[in-house]
Amino acid sequence: MGRKLYYVLATLQLVAVFLFCGGFFPQKVVLKNDSKFIVNPEVQLASKPVFKKLVLVVIDALRSDFLFQKDSSDFEFLHGLLNSGEAWGYTAYSNPPTVTLPRLKGITTGSAPNFLDAILNVAEDDTSSNLKEQDSLLKQFHTHHYKMNFFGDDTWLKLFPLEFFSEYDGTNSFFVSDFEEVDFNVTRHVPYQMEHQKNWDVLILHYLGLDHIGHKGGSKSHFMPSKHREMDSVIKQIYEKIDGDTLMVVLGDHGMNDLGNHGGSSSGETSAALAFLSKRLKKYQSSDIQQSSNVPVEDAHPDYKYLKEVEQIDIVPTLSMLFNLPIPKNSMGVIIDELLQLLPSKLAAIKVQDNYLQLTKLKPGYEAQLEKKSAGTLLEEMREIQSSLAMAATNYNYTFLTYGTTLMIIGTLIVTVWNFQLSQEYIEHVGTSVLLGISMFASSFIEEEHQIWWWITISVLLLMQISNGKKLVVLSGLRLIRGWNNSGQKYIYDNVLHTLLKSHTSVLWWLNVVTFLSVGFPFLRNKDESEKMVSLLSVSFLALSSITYKICFAIVNGDKVPSGLYTFALRSCAMYLANENATESDISQCLVPIARIFFQICGVSIIILLFMKYALNKSTNMLNKLLSVIKFVLLLQTSSANIPLFLIFEILTSVTPDITPIFSLCLQNLTFFQFGGTNSIATVNLTNAYNGVSSNYNIYVVGVLMFLSNYAPSIYWALSLIPQSYKQKTLRLQHYYITGTCLMIACIALRYHLFIWSVFSPKLCYYAAWSLYNVVMDFAITLLGVL
């Protein structure tokens, strides 16, 4: 295939993918204008709200067990309120995608999330999700002259006009390395707000630290208990200052999985905590389940369902009822029935009827009937309507879907005909592509795609023309890779190598040191003394700076490191800070500078290598040295427990230096999954996306670092094909054309499937990411091949 046709087809694939995504993830159509009271508006307008003030405390990623289960919760003060009846607790189901932006939309508008919001969630300067023109709980508060103050996650300030707030102070939501200052910047406002309660009617606090701890160390991080106690003390500080006319609501916007990530649809991610706090509640009856329970609950539930379960969007009509506001027009929520007790019976009946008529307007053709229906009957009917609305919350753009799919089919036919040949390599490529394409029609195969890649990789290895001894070595290496991490979304195994090494830190860290040194070996192969000296200095600085950073990073995150490496890191930081008495608490100050020094050394090393080749005509092992610099970057962007996998990679490449394109394709995909990646947004790793980034968030820098950290193993194996012929490139392009075509057809055919948003949509996003990855790697391989 000619070069021009290759680039035309590569461009056509990207255009087709983004056209299809544009049709599959359109902006949701919403009802315009603000809502008004529907049933007996004169009675409702004349009624007084149950509460005069609201304190809304959002603790990001507060999973239900963090509040209600004994082994996972340290909210001692809140537990006391739950047991005394002054607090009513619920497990609030948060619809996927379980990331902050769509969940905040859900708890303020009551509407179902748009999957596109999960992507926009990482765009710091995005304004397309603004709710200025959409009816919401905050807009109703503003319209009815409630004074609102806000402190916390600045996502709120992107969603709502600043004129909604009398006072506000936003904190950055994506600098996940920080889980102390980000919460202190919220709590420091609390004393003043409590002393000047006349200055506000609604106080919103959004804490991010717990979520950041989850991203860094998982749901069982040893930082969790202290963070729980910190949040509990904030709740106590506020609750003891407010009176009976103030309602306090504590909730999580979503939960998290055991790895501390979120975005998917697992029980841990969708089960958020919710609690209503007021001294008045003691006079009424909480849910039957709460009355028969003692909080914290002894037994741990694998589905994270504690106390009574409600929909998270039910908060919207419930708060609207308690503050006598019209329910936002697009709300799909249903009033939480226990809280109806706080209203006079006649007014409570009116509020339920109002909720019923408002909800039925969202379902075209539904005949609303109020006559002779009790409040209980209406609530039950509303929950059925709510369920059906959630299933049909998206309007697809079929024109874009058709164009995107048609372009993919045309591209697939062209690249298949052009590449056609009766060779083993071609048959292996087509067989792999067809097998993966068929799997796109089954949600379980998408969730467990790593199983398919494992089977294909082993099959391709057995067909390779290498000695049995080499096959045995490669097979052993692949088995170690296979058993290193938990992969997929369905099963979690306790005895994986990743977990075992974490409990044997000395073995882990000395393997890490050996891995860093092995990556630098190409620098030691030189022809003359001057080249040898420059190479030795380069590899020394690269290895020392990267190892030092990873050790410091581990110490700051509370991970154990061998005493010798601990002392080395402490002395390194003492030298940098010019402070001989530096302690462990000072190490965090060195993280950003050390990472930046490392990246600067990488840049200088590349410049020196290019200078020596083109100016001094000294280019011994030039390509491998450039690849070594890239590998050092990949190691820095990899979690400490996964770094030894690169040592296995180095062994495999030395055993099979001439890797075939199909085997490289298999390894790119297999290692992506075996590093812990999946087809769920929940496993997008942000931990290393901030290496060298200060609190001045830069989405482009973070985006590149996030790309490197999530695709590090795949990048390694893609770079194994230098130089790469256009025949090899087109075979890879053919694979992604075939699988992409099947995925698009599957998404259209299964657009009303139960798992369309939790399985197929994330897979489509990952496919788009893989398409971009291929373009980037193609450019990088071409550039390195020229050098």
Swiss-Prot record:
Glycosylated residues, chain numbering: 33, 185, 397, 485, 581, 617, 669
Keyword field: Endoplasmic reticulum, Glycoprotein, GPI-anchor biosynthesis, Membrane, Transferase, Transmembrane, Transmembrane helix
Membrane-protein topology: Multi-pass membrane protein
Pfam family, one: PIGO_PIGG
GO BP of this protein: GPI anchor biosynthetic process
CDD domains: GPI_EPT_2
Chief subcellular location: endoplasmic reticulum
EC number assigned by the record: 2.-.-.-
Protein family membership: Belongs to the PIGG/PIGN/PIGO family. PIGG subfamily.
Gene: LAS21
Subcellular location: Endoplasmic reticulum membrane
One Gene Ontology molecular-function label: CP2 mannose-ethanolamine phosphotransferase activity
Keyword Endoplasmic reticulum carried by entry: yes
Protein name: GPI ethanolamine phosphate transferase 2
GO cellular component: endoplasmic reticulum membrane
Keyword match Magnesium: no
Transmembrane segments: 400-420, 426-446, 455-475, 504-524, 536-556, 591-611, 629-651, 671-693, 699-719, 740-760, 767-787
Pathway assigned in UniProt: Glycolipid biosynthesis; glycosylphosphatidylinositol-anchor biosynthesis
Function according to Swiss-Prot or TrEMBL: Ethanolamine phosphate transferase involved in glycosylphosphatidylinositol-anchor biosynthesis. Transfers ethanolamine phosphate to the GPI second mannose.
